[in-house]
Amino acid sequence: MSAKLERLSQTLRDVLGDVVESLVVDRGEVTIEVAAGNFLDVARRLRDEAALGFEQLMDISGIDYSAFGNGAWQGKRFASVAHLLSVKNNWRLRLRVFADDDDFPVLGSLVEVWPSANWFEREAFDLYGILYAGHPDLRRILTDYGFVGHPFRKDFPISGYVEMRYDPEQGRVVYQPVTIEPRENTPRIVREENYGDVGHG
C-alpha cells in the first residue's frame, strides 16, 4: 500500500472511528462501508472535517448484489456507492452503504450534503428502485413514463415486460406485451486451433 493510501486510511480511522464497519484498500482505492443509520452523518463529516475535506461528490452508483459471486452472496441485496474527491488532499474515496430492507430499499439522500447527488440518486432509483429519503425530486430520469420495474435489478427479464411500436392505424406509439421468446443468454467462445490467426504473420 502506498504511503498516500496509508495516510488516508489512518485519517479515516482517526476521524470516523467505530462508525466505519469496513475499510478496504484494493487496486489503489480506499472503500469504507457504513451502516445506513450513520450514512448521512458520515457524509457530512467526510465533507466538513478539515483533516478529510471531501468537498466533491463525483458519482453515486446503485448495486444489486443478489447474483454476486454466482449467487453465493449472503449479505444485503442493494447498496449505494458514492465516489468522493478531496481536491485539497488529492484523495479519492468510495463510500458504500447497504439498504437494510431488500424488498423496499431506502437510504438517506445526499443532496443536502452534495447537491450534485440529485441526478445520480434519481438514476439509482430509476434503474435499481433504491429510494432516497429526503430527495427533493425523486422521479425516473432514464426510463419512459409509466415504465414498470427497475431494469438493472438482477431479477428483471432481459427482454423486459412490454415492448413499444408505432401503430400506423392509431397514428401513435403503442405498448404491448413482449413477443420475444425468453432464451438462455450464454456467451459462446470459439476455441478452434487457428482462431484469430494467433501466431501467424
Curated annotation (Swiss-Prot):
Its main location: membrane. It catalyses: a quinone + NADH + 5 H(+)(in) = a quinol + NAD(+) + 4 H(+)(out). One of its GO terms (molecular function) is NADH dehydrogenase (ubiquinone) activity. It is found in: Cell inner membrane. The keyword Cell inner membrane applies. It is a peripheral membrane protein. One of its GO terms (cellular component) is plasma membrane. PROSITE patterns: COMPLEX1_30K. Keywords: Cell inner membrane, Cell membrane, Membrane, NAD, Quinone, Translocase, Transport, Ubiquinone. It comes from the Bacteria. Its EC number is 7.1.1.-. Belongs to the complex I 30 kDa subunit family. NDH-1 shuttles electrons from NADH, via FMN and iron-sulfur (Fe-S) centers, to quinones in the respiratory chain. The immediate electron acceptor for the enzyme in this species is believed to be ubiquinone. Couples the redox reaction to proton translocation (for every two electrons transferred, four hydrogen ions are translocated across the cytoplasmic membrane), and thus conserves the redox energy in a proton gradient. NDH-1 is composed of 14 different subunits. Subunits NuoB, C, D, E, F, and G constitute the peripheral sector of the complex. This is NADH-quinone oxidoreductase subunit C. It comes from Azoarcus sp. (strain BH72).
